[in-house]
Amino acid sequence: MADVPPTRGLARTALYAGLLAGALDIAAAILQNLEHPARVILQSVATGWLGASAYEGGWSTAWLGLISHFCIMLGIAAIYVSLAVIWPLLQRRWIVASVAWGAVVWAVMSFVVVPISASTVEPAGAMWPAVQGLITHILAVGLPMAWITRRMLGADR
């Protein structure tokens, strides 16, 4: 266990990875749904807490959605960083790992998280939105998380 970086370094890595991926992911969601105001996209995240009434809450529920989104991304980043410490191969083969991690995150979000919320986001079964979501999660979530983890923890392990 002498190889394990200090907890502070792991937390900082997860923080940076989560913030970057969170910003890229929510920006992509807003840009891919320009037919809806950004407020509505953020409120769709808050439906996990409030159900459909999140859409009636104005900017207060949009802020709740944004904060929730970043908390989710920080959790996802913490899991990835922990896995990368356990399996250093994730740092050495970070590009392959980023594709796999983005796909895993997309699958969990599409088939577990979104269905149990009251979000009006299209279901993952529709082909183009599913492909678009998968690509977005690979590029906006998997890639930055893997890159930051490799960069901050080192790939020589």
Predicted region positions:
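Membrane-interface interhelical connector segments
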Residues: E35-G58
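Aromatic-anchored segments of alpha-helical transmembrane domains
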Residues: G22-I26, G102-V112
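Hydrophobic alpha-helical transmembrane segments
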Residues: L64-A84
